[in-house]
Amino acid sequence: MRISVDTKAIIHVGEYSRGGRSRGVVAVKVLDHDMCLKEKLVPGGILEPVTGRSFLFFGTHYKTSDFMVDGIFLWWEERRQELSGVKHLVINLDNGPECNGHRSQFHRSMTEFADTTGLCVRLVYYNPPYHSK
């Protein structure tokens, strides 16, 4: 089984000005300054290239190694019944700062994932960082 995992930039949630224009009949009221942003979401996603299925996960703090592995755990819990025959998992990663080959925390968390699930996990990195397109 092969999956591709990636995270995106933090999204600030709220009625903040984006410098755009209203396309509706009535303009949407927004705050005129984006200071003291309180609400944010960190999006992450997993794609199964063979089936075309995708799985989105969100956090509220930062893009970290643990955030990425937690997303993989969530995906596995969601798909475990359907993928019960899978013994090997190949994970494509973009070699970004939260998951690159030098991050011992990421490797430690991935080892925990492999031990918990019983899967043989292989990490495949795109090089250089952020060139996963």
Model region roles, listed by residue range:
Residues 24-26:
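A contiguous, basic/glycine-rich beta-loop/short-helix subdomain that forms a polymer-engagement track
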Residues 29-92, 97:
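Electropositive, glycine- and tryptophan-enriched low-complexity nucleic-acid-binding patches
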